[in-house]
């Protein structure tokens, strides 16, 4: 693989930044203060854990913020308090005679991408608005409406308006609550928490876009809860994947229905268990299993996904890693059926695998109110890991990527990103192209 002079300078710049600022302390106190303020808006009973160190408080706050957003369906905008319906009784249900305004949140994802030998391509990838409402103390609503690529018109290359989430929470106890509607499938790290400032890199990790579908949502219902001692869970029955859309390059990723013509004839199960009972550490594991014979009459393959992941922070360093494996039963029968229907062999594998590891360093000294993060991520992902009998793997889809870059945060919820991607595959014929990415993202 050839590395251009520009790419070499990019890598050198990042290494110099990391080396030259190795003694700097991360600016996380402002982030902690901001999250504590938002948690107070979400939960008036919240009391900061002042006895913990700053990093421990940040870790605990991120976990509690995720739980609060899911349980209360109230967004954390800076002006959220002023937008809440007000009544003398303090009960949302009794505010019908007043002007009721919904809590509103949102995020934006603007990219400029360039592959080797190609020109720069700007794209307003995502603009998302989130709306929540409390019908009572025990019934909450939450939704996300997403516009992709800035414009919707006829044709396959146009943008898209999509319902990303829309569900009701029925809150019974901290350990047991009912959720129903359009749900994000709880597999991996990024699928449920994908606001641009929450992950490094302009684009989401390849493993969490291909081996695990990205923005994967399905219709369904299930249960959520906080079990105490650092454990929390989500378990859902959802609509199934569509195996007729599986292929060699993206595996099962194109099989998500996103609620359109979804099938519950053979509901799938998805579940996630997380543990954050150790300081600075969050560990999670997810499982998914469901039949996917949807539009493939005569063949009903089962898709099973297992993943483990972990996030750890120590002083100025953040570490993140994930492993995922996908199994597709009856892949050979599926390939033969789809070839009969379309004339093209999709070469769907019976097993797909991916993993990544990412260290990140907070560079700026604590006296600065901004944050500058240098990171590197190695990913290995193979959608042709194991083939059914009679099929050979396509080696161009046995891939690896090195991503190195920086993220500048002038405020905790605003990120300006730059990265360079070194792509490789195992094919001697099809060359993997390197890429350069610039991005701006925010959420409120």
Which residues does each PLM region occupy?
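Bacterial N-terminal signal peptides
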Residues: 9-19
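Short glycine/proline- and charge-enriched loop/turn segments
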Residues: 197-205, 251-255, 336-340
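N-terminal periplasmic/intermembrane-space "pro-region" immediately following the signal or transit peptide
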Residues: 22-109
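Outer membrane beta-barrel
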Residues: 91-243, 265-270, 274-282, 351, ...
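Active-site rim elements
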Residues: 208-210, 257-260, 345
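N-terminal secretory signal peptides that target proteins for export/translocation
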Residues: 1-7
């Amino acid at each position: 693989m050839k590395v251009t002079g520009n790419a070499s300078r990019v890598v050198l710049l990042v290494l110099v930044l990391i080396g030259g600022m190795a003694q700097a302390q991360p600016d996380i106190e402002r982030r902690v203060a901001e999250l504590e303020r938002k948690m107070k808006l979400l939960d008036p009973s919240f009391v900061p854990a002042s006895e913990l160190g700053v990093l421990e408080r940040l870790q605990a706050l991120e976990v509690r913020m995720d739980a609060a957003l899911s349980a209360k369906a109230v967004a954390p905008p800076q002006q959220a308090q002023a937008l809440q319906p007000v009544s003398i009784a303090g009960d949302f249900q009794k505010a019908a005679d007043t002007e009721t305004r919904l809590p509103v949140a949102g995020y934006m994802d603007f990219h400029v991408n360039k592959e080797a030998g190609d020109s720069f391509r700007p794209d307003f990838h995502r603009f998302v608005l989130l709306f929540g409402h409390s019908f009572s103390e025990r019934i909450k609503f939450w939704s996300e409406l997403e516009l992709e690529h800035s414009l919707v018109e006829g044709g396959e290359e146009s943008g898209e308006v999509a319902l990303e989430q829309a569900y009701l929470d029925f809150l019974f106890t901290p350990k047991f609550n009912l959720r129903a509607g359009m749900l994000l499938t709880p597999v991996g790290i990024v699928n449920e928490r994908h606001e641009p400032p929450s992950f490094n890199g302009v684009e989401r990790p390849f493993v969490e876009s291909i081996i695990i579908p990205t923005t994967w949502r399905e219709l369904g219902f299930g249960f959520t809860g906080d079990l105490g001692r650092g454990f929390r869970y989500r378990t859902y029955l959802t609509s199934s994947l569509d195996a007729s859309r599986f292929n060699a390059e993206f595996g099962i990723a194109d099989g998500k229905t996103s609620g359109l013509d979804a099938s519950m004839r053979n509901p799938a199960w998805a579940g996630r268990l997380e543990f954050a009972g150790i300081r600075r550490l969050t560990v999670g594991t997810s499982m998914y299993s469901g039949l996917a014979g949807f539009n493939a009459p005569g063949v009903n393959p089962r898709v099973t996904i297992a993943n483990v992941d972990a996030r750890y922070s120590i002083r100025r360093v953040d570490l993140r890693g994930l492993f995922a494996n996908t199994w597709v039963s009856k892949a050979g029968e599926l390939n033969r059926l789809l070839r009969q229907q379309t004339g093209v062999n999709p070469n769907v594998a019976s097993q797909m695998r991916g993993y990544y590891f990412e260290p990140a360093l907070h560079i700026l000294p604590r006296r600065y109110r901004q944050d500058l993060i240098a990171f590197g991520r190695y990913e290995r992902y193979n959608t042709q890991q194991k083939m059914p009998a009679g099929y050979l793997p396509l080696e161009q889809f046995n891939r690896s990527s090195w991503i190195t870059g920086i993220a500048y945060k002038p405020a905790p919820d605003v990120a300006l990103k730059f990265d360079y991607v070194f792509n490789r595959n195992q094919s001697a014929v099809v060359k993997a192209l390197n890429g350069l990415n610039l991005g701006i993202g925010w959420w409120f």
